[in-house]
A protein has these predicted regions:
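FMN-binding flavodoxin-like domain, especially the glycine-rich phosphate-binding loop
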Residues: 7, 11, 15, 19, ...
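A short beta-strand-loop structural module common to alpha/beta enzyme folds
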Residues: 19-30
């Protein structure tokens, strides 16, 4: 799944008109790097029983040390809505929970319509907290979902 997240990050960056030089692996995240940007687009695959990818545990610590109160944060994740229907894209829900007290402005909430899953902690107030993507079962929907989400995020941060 790690390579799927990286591929999705690059595809999303392209739709957001973000140069590839501004796409970073979370393992390289530093306070100085975070402070360079007003908008953060954060993505993670969901591992095991609805867990973050391991590098994110340190990444969250870095983010919590930063002043995010004037930053916009958009989340995306990849998951498997068939095999892990009860923890679909939980990783972005974990990131949301970990960062909601930083006073950042979350953007890019996505309607649950069109998704088939049983449960996800990434659903808050009836919407996903970011963009969930399923490259295992619904890869034919990914490009359209990314395009629509990127336009939404652009509008929300302008």
């Amino acid at each position: 799944m790690l390579f799927r997240s990286e591929d999705l990050a690059r595809r999303i960056a392209e739709k957001l008109d973000v140069p590839s030089a501004d796409v970073f692996d979370v393992s390289k995240l530093t306070e100085a790097l975070v402070n360079e940007y007003d908008v953060l687009v954060l993505g993670s695959s969901t591992w095991g029983a609805g867990e973050l990818q391991d590098d994110w545990y340190d990444g969250v610590k870095v983010l919590k040390k930063c002043d995010l109160s004037h930053k916009s944060v958009a989340l995306f994740g990849c998951g498997d809505s068939d095999s892990y229907s009860d923890t679909f894209c939980d990783a972005i829900g974990i990131l949301y929970e970990d960062l909601k007290d930083t006073h950042c402005k979350f953007c890019g909430a996505t309607d649950t319509a069109g998704y088939t899953f049983d449960s996800s902690i990434a659903v808050v107030d009836g919407k996903f907290v970011g963009l969930p993507l399923d490259e295992v079962n619904e890869d034919s929907k990914t490009d359209e979902r990314i395009s629509a989400w990127a336009e939404q995020v652009k509008q929300e941060i302008s």
